[in-house]
């Protein structure tokens, strides 16, 4: 293992007797992996264990772990309001410590962010009855008994964290109950808990005093807070600094975990506190660094720090004490280990796609094993069986990942790609400026295929003879799909959406875009058409724009549509397109009223997904030993698909060659099929 004495990332940090082995960490986040009893079971623990094995210094877990039953919002949240969690924490901490890493939890009361319709139907409460847009509850105002109760249960939760063998904890003041008392936007009280800054700090200080009484002086306690929420009417930089200095003065804290902006709207989440692909790298490092100069406690920070160069800069320049690469570790939990062995160039980069913040959190578009470590491997093991010859046809996401995993298994892999470049449909996604980082999904795999010795053959439209000449034991068809509009009457009059996205055709005049999927294609078309068309009508089958995407992607498209002046018309069905002189007559139906309406256009572009390119698959079926059939049970359970008793070639298809889905599905197909081949 290489020594990195000159690397600032590998300088240990000591906090109250705890030595953190390097400066890289993962912050607490709501992974959604808690079990049915809101406990950190095996699935939850394995997710964090991979990061510890990968070499980071500190993994923090349990984002929004609730201290009482009126602080719920999601089924996967952890419940630290009961002693039942202690054995789980003990097991958890032992496994993380065995890998040389430290472990801490976040405890909180959500206040107005609690969702009253979740499980127990208790009303949300807050310092004042000020509604939050994001979680939508109208909270009741807390009375003195509520305040005393929350102070007490926060202390009890902290005691459980210590009994569980954890190294420390953080409270969540950023947008949660403590922060709601701190902020003038949410605290409208006129008693001793509201008004001036000292009063607004009172509740938070009471909480931390109680925590310190419960855990003693040796246990590490920090607070997560925003350094500037002024855009939402909250505390600005100067007042936030005063808050931090007040808490420092009282001596209850050992570190600050600092963020920027608000969390009360999708826009604030996607552009401020958890910035995605549309935001530049590490947008808040400079203001966080300025804040750090005015406090004395160690400072942690996470916000789109996705590359090692930026992380090194943050530590070297004294902007941070611990650099949190949370989403970067979702993409690759082995970041530190790869640096240590000289493989920094092989780190799988986070592209900021925000899939990990969606309903399937913490899954990663780039890394299908994340969040599924209990069943699917982060590290592909080399096969103990004789090497096989595997042919992959198609160099899109599914084909690239299938080739990579098969090569990791030690097999001889040949990949055929019909075009002059790898990437498939992903190459079109990078054509929109704010999504250009998607190119990293292609580039990383290209590099891995080169390292692993995959024989990549471009500009070859593989036919059956092309494949069979290779005498493979396994053939994987990953030929993707092409736009399919066959169900629309007059589909032949519609313009191919890919021709527009690739700029092979520039629509002008009156343009209608029909978005029948709720994915990226429709809005991407709008970006390409806007400015060239004399008029643009955007119709969609869904009630909201980009419905199939995560909130972090939806809000960016909505912002861009607002800036372009595009007003999408929802719940519409495109029925037919007919020629009418030099124009097109377009017939639509409102799903709300059933009313048929007709308009005219010069160009109609419809996105209704893709249909599989499966001609080659059909031709090879009869020559395969499995008739091209995938054993679904084996596929789901991760078992080997191959019947070693049968001679000849086994044939499979994955990704859009099977069905029109997304990149994450294509990657997962490849993992499930190939990791046991």
In which residue ranges do the predicted regions lie?
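Rossmann-like dinucleotide-binding cores of NAD(P)H-dependent redox enzymes
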Residues: 412-452, 520-521, 525-574
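Flexible, Lys/Arg-rich cytosolic regulatory linkers and terminal tails that connect or flank
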Residues: 351, 357-369, 373, 564, ...
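Hydrophobic, well-ordered secondary-structure elements that form the walls
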Residues: 256, 291, 314, 326, ...
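Short beta-alpha connecting loops at secondary-structure transitions
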Residues: 270-277, 321, 426-434, 542, ...
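Rossmann-like dinucleotide/flavin-binding elements
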Residues: 384-418, 422, 458-471, 478-551, ...
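Flavin-dependent oxidoreductase catalytic cores
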Residues: 1-393, 397, 401, 405-408, ...
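Short acidic loop-to-helix transition motifs that present clustered carboxylates
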Residues: 306-309, 330, 461-464, 500-502, ...
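A conserved short coil-to-beta-strand element within the FAD-binding core of flavoproteins
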Residues: 458-470, 570-584
């Amino acid at each position: 293992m290489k020594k990195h004495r000159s690397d600032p990332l590998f300088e240990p940090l000591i906090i109250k007797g705890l030595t953190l082995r390097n400066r890289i960490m993962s912050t607490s986040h709501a992974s959604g992996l808690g079990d049915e009893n809101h406990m950190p079971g095996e699935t939850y623990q394995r997710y964090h264990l991979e990061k510890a094995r990968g070499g980071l210094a500190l993994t923090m877990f349990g984002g929004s772990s609730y201290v009482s039953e009126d602080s719920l919002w999601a089924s996967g949240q952890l419940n630290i309001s009961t002693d039942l969690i202690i054995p789980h924490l003990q097991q958890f901490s032992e496994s993380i410590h065995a890998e040389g890493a430290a472990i801490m939890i976040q405890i909180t009361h959500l206040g107005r962010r609690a969702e009253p319709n979740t499980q127990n139907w208790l009303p949300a409460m807050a310092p004042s009855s000020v509604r939050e847009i994001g979680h939508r509850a109208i909270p009741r105002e807390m009375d003195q008994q509520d305040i005393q109760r929350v102070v007490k249960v926060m202390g009890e939760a902290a005691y459980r964290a210590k009994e569980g063998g954890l190294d420390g904890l953080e409270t969540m003041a950023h947008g949660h109950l403590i922060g709601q008392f701190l902020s003038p936007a949410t605290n409208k009280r006129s008693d001793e808990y509201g008004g001036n800054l000292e009063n607004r700090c009172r509740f938070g200080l009471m909480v931390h005093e109680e925590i310190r009484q419960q855990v003693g002086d040796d246990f590490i306690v920090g607070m997560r807070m925003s350094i500037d929420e002024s855009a939402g009417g909250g505390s600005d930089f100067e007042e936030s600094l005063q808050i931090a200095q007040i808490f420092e003065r009282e001596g209850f804290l050992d570190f600050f975990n600092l963020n920027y902006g608000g969390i009360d709207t999708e826009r604030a989440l996607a552009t401020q506190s958890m910035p995605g692909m549309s935001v530049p790298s590490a947008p808040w490092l400079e203001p966080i660094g300025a804040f750090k100069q005015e406090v004395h406690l160690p400072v942690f920070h996470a916000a789109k720090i996705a590359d090692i160069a930026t992380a090194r800069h943050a530590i070297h320049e004294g902007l941070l004490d611990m650099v949190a690469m949370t989403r970067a570790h979702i993409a690759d939990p082995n970041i530190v280990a790869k640096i240590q062995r000289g493989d920094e160039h092989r780190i799988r980069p986070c592209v900021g796609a925000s899939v990990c913040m969606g309903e399937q959190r913490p899954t990663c578009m780039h890394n299908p094993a994340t969040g599924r470590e209990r069943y699917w491997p982060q590290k592909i093991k080399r096969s103990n069986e004789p090497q096989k010859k595997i042919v992959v046809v198609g160099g899109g996401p599914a084909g690239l990942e299938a080739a990579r995993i098969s090569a990791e298994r030690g097999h001889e892999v040949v990949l055929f790609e019909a075009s002059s470049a790898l990437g498939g449909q992903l190459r079109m996604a990078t054509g929109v400026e704010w999504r250009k980082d998607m190119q990293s999904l292609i580039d990383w795999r290209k590099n891995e295929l080169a390292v692993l010795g995959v024989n990549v053959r471009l500009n070859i439209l593989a036919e059956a003879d092309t494949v069979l000449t290779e005498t493979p034991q396994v053939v994987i068809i990953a030929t993707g799909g092409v736009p399919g509009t066959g169900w629309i009457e007059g589909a032949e009059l519609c313009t191919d959406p890919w021709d527009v996205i690739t700029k092979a055709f520039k629509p002008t005049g009156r343009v209608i875009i029909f978005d029948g999927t709720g994915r990226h294609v429709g809005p991407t078309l709008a970006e390409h058409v806007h400015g060239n068309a004399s008029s643009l009508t955007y119709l969609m089958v869904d009630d909201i724009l980009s419905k199939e995407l995560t909130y972090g992607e939806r809000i960016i498209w909505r912002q861009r549509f607002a800036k372009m002046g595009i007003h999408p018309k929802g719940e519409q069905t495109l029925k037919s397109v007919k020629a009418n002189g030099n124009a097109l007559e377009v017939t639509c139906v409102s799903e709300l009223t059933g009313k048929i309406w007709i308009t005219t256009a010069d160009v109609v572009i419809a996105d209704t997904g893709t249909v599989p390119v499966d001609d080659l698959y059909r031709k090879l079926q009869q020559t395969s030993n499995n008739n091209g059939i995938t054993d679904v049970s084996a596929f789901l359970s991760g078992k080997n698909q191959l019947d070693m008793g049968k001679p000849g070639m086994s044939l499979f298809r994955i990704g859009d060659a099977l069905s029109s889905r997304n990149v994450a599905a294509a990657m997962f197909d490849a993992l499930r099929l190939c990791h046991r081949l």
